[in-house]
A protein has these predicted regions:
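Sec-dependent signal peptide recognition
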Residues: 2-8
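Hydrophobic h-region of N-terminal signal peptides that target proteins for export
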Residues: 9-17
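Beta-strand-rich domains and repeat architectures in extracellular enzymes and scaffolds
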Residues: 22-53
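A flexible loop/linker signature enriched in serine peptidases of the S9 family
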Residues: 27, 45-51, 59, 65-71, ...
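Short coil/turn segments that connect the beta-strands within blades of beta-propeller domains
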Residues: 38-40, 78-80, 122-124
Length: 155
């Protein structure tokens, strides 16, 4: 009887109807926030996704979707892109979302997880840290197209 009941539950779960879940969040914890260079928008992470909204409040627009975990949004100096940490490639990398063409680009493409991204003042490079046992607290510099990386000596 126990096996039969378990089989019924598995069958119900397998062929059950999918339901769309939605929620309204009015507060959160451990949220990373960045203000756009023009001071009109904010970007923030909540429950593993990146959102933007007016600095005056209102409805947030999701930049990321799906099952990946996304965090630490940072506007580019010109405000046309947002960099963030995401595991969408299987490991934490720095990704950039371009508002103009709505495309995502993996900037780091490393075997090591990369975190704590920040932009160069001209927006042509991003910097991030990675846990590399060969180098103490390495800071990596990446150009925006991911074809060059170098370790920046720290302290």
């Amino acid at each position: 009887m126990k096996k039969y009941f378990s089989l019924l539950i598995m069958l119900a779960v397998t062929i059950g109807q999918a339901e769309k879940l939605s929620y309204n969040a009015t507060e959160g914890t451990l949220i990373s926030v960045d203000v756009s260079p023009d001071g009109k928008q904010i970007a923030f992470d909540l429950l593993g996704h990146i959102y933007t909204m007016s600095i005056n409040g209102g409805k947030a627009t999701a930049i990321t979707k799906g099952t990946s975990w996304n965090m630490f949004p940072r506007y580019s100096p010109d405000g046309k892109k947002i960099m963030f940490t995401s595991d969408r490639s299987g490991s934490d990398d720095l990704w950039v979302y371009d508002f103009y063409n709505a495309e995502f680009t993996n900037v780091t493409k490393m075997k090591l997880p990369v975190h704590q991204g920040t932009w160069s003042t001209d927006g042509r490079h991003v910097f991030g840290t990675a846990l590399n046992m060969k180098v103490r607290h390495p800071v990596y510099m990446f150009n925006m197209y991911g074809d060059k990386q170098e370790i920046i000596p720290v302290g």
